[in-house]
């Protein structure tokens, strides 16, 4: 147990009630940061917001229906750097609870149906591999076919995934 956790437990303060802003070092009530969509009220620093949390922020509660969750990354090149890509994918899936960096689907905003896609930087920095590209392509095609407004939110910072070579670059 960390010293901070021990101090918190001794004071009776629940874990996650407060967070420290890395932008200004202000201690912020987590609920306040959440109400500000992940921003610090003092300096406007933007905290990490997960893809699932972003869905909750954007769509009407309980309306999201995920598309193409069964698409899974493969390792066609059997790529290995410090770790085999196949092992990296499994560890990222276990760590994040995501199958890949993109989440796509449909939901409602003020009772209007929309198509929504987003990337989550927690999964290999939100980098684009073949699954990300395929999910976004299918999202765009379905939104067009169904005449739905399309919203894509990039939580990415990773670029194309080198582990998949040309397959990620073709996206």
Predicted feature descriptions by range:
Residues 1-171:
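Terminal-region recognition feature
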């Amino acid at each position: 147990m960390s010293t901070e956790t021990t101090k918190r437990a001794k004071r009776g303060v629940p874990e996650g009630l407060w967070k420290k802003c890395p932008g200004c070092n202000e201690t912020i009530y987590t609920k306040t940061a959440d109400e500000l969509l992940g921003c610090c009220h003092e300096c406007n620093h933007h905290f990490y917001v997960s893809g699932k949390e972003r869905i909750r922020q954007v769509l009407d509660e309980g309306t999201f229906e995920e598309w193409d969750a069964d698409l899974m990354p493969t390792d066609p090149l059997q790529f290995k750097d410090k770790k085999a890509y196949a092992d990296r994918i499994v560890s990222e899936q276990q760590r994040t609870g995501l199958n890949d960096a993109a989440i796509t689907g449909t939901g409602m905003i003020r009772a209007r149906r929309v198509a929504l896609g987003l990337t989550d930087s927690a999964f290999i920095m939100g980098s684009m591999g073949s699954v990300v590209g395929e999910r976004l392509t299918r999202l765009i095609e379905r939104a067009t076919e169904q005449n739905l407004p399309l919203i894509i939110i990039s939580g990415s910072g990773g670029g194309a995934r080198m582990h998949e070579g040309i397959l990620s670059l073709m996206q």
